[in-house]
Every structure is written in structure tokens, then in C-alpha cells.
Design a protein with these regions (language model features):
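Residues that scaffold the ATP/ADP-binding catalytic core of kinase and kinase-like folds
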Residues: 24
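A short, conserved alpha-helix in the catalytic core of glycosyltransferases
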Residues: 1-20
């Protein structure tokens, strides 16, 4: 996160090939004797997963680097997922991190998910998960409509679309447009990159 924010802020990152530096111990302790050599400690996996999910909540796309390990910047969009036929907290666990907000038709399932997931993040999940009546009030720039039932019929392919959604939008989706891709229907008001607003913590 910090290196991506530096890059977006216009900082020049210089890599020295002839220097010594302290290495963060967060990765140094990832394997303990009790787990065996090369096996990640359970606590490391917990914190790594938690950090990864918070990163996705903010940036909506996993980090990528160039050949010199410099972060590659990408746009971030204010996007809401409008989902029907929601029955599974496990489904929400996957889908929630990839959007700014999600709107679901099963508030009981949503409340159970929030109760379980909230202890793992400082982000107030009640500001991210709403029922359908909040769609106009939240006013996302982009809305993506789909159902859990249709999604699960081809979960691998549909998951791949969700994880590539930022790139798909960046490749040429226009303002005030409607488009369909498989089970997904997208409506846009404005296709606006909000990444610059995420630099300051």
C-alpha cells in the first residue's frame, strides 16, 4: 500500500544495489519449528490474509510490479455490486472486498457476515454492505448487477471477471453506458479514477 501511494503521489523511488538495510521481521518469523521448515505459521497466515483483504477493499485489484519490482499504478473506481439471490456468507466473504459497496437482498445473511468479519478489520463493514433500498442514496459511479445463483453456475469464470473488473473497465468502458458480460450487467454514470483520493491515509 505505501509504495503504491508513493508512486501515485509522484515520489521517485530509488533502489540501491550496494547497501545494507534492516529487513522487516514480519516475514522473517513466518515459519516456526513447530510447523516445519518452509511451512507458514498459522498466525502469519491469519495476519497476511487480513492485510490482503483490507488492501483489496481499498484498491479493488491485487498489486502488480514491473521487472524492477516497482509498483504498477492502476485506476480505482467507485463501484457498487447489486446482488440478488444471496444465500451464502462464504459468497459474501469472496465478493465483498472487490467493490466500494455491495447491495444485497438478504439482510440477515449480510448481518451474519458482518458480525463474523468485522473483528478482522477496522473498516466499518456496515458502511460497505447495504440492502437494495440504499442504491440511490449511496450513488456509486458504476453499478454491476448479478445474482449469486447465476454466479455459482460457473464460479471460476465469474470469479475471474470480478478479479479483472478494474482492467475491464479501464479498457474502454464509457460514461453513461450499459453493457453485459456473461451474467453481469454494468451501468455507468461516470467512469472516474479515484486513486488520487486514496493517497492520504
Amino acid at each position: 500500500d505505501i509504495f503504491l501511494r508513493w508512486k501515485l503521489a509522484g515520489y521517485k523511488l530509488i533502489q540501491s544495489r550496494d547497501s545494507l538495510c534492516f529487513h522487516f521481521i514480519s516475514r522473517g518469523h513466518r515459519s516456526w519449528a513447530k510447523n516445519g521448515v518452509g511451512k507458514d505459521d498459522d498466525m502469519f497466515k491469519f495476519y497476511n490474509n487480513r492485510a490482503s483483504r483490507n488492501y483489496l477493499r481499498k484498491w479493488h485489484k491485487w498489486m502488480s510490479h514491473d521487472e524492477y519490482r516497482m509498483p504498477i499504478t492502476h485506476p480505482v473506481y467507485n463501484i457498487g455490486f447489486v446482488i440478488t439471490d444471496v444465500t451464502s456468507e462464504d459468497f459474501l466473504h469472496f465478493i465483498e472486498t472487490w467493490a466500494t459497496n455491495i447491495f444485497i437482498d438478504n439482510t440477515i445473511c449480510g448481518d451474519r457476515y458482518i458480525s463474523k468479519e468485522q473483528p478482522t478489520t477496522k473498516i466499518d463493514l456496515s458502511t460497505r454492505i447495504h440492502n437494495h433500498s440504499y442504491i440511490e442514496q449511496i450513488n456509486n459511479d458504476i453499478l454491476l448487477y448479478f445474482s449469486q445463483k447465476d454466479f455459482m453456475l460457473n464460479a471460476n469464470e465469474n470469479s475471474a471477471i470480478i478479479t479483472r473488473l478494474t482492467d475491464i473497465i479501464a479498457e474502454g468502458v464509457e460514461d453513461n453506458a450499459e453493457m453485459e458480460l456473461g451474467i453481469f450487467k454494468m451501468k455507468t454514470k461516470i467512469v472516474k479514477d479515484i486513486s488520487q483520493t486514496l493517497i492520504k491515509v
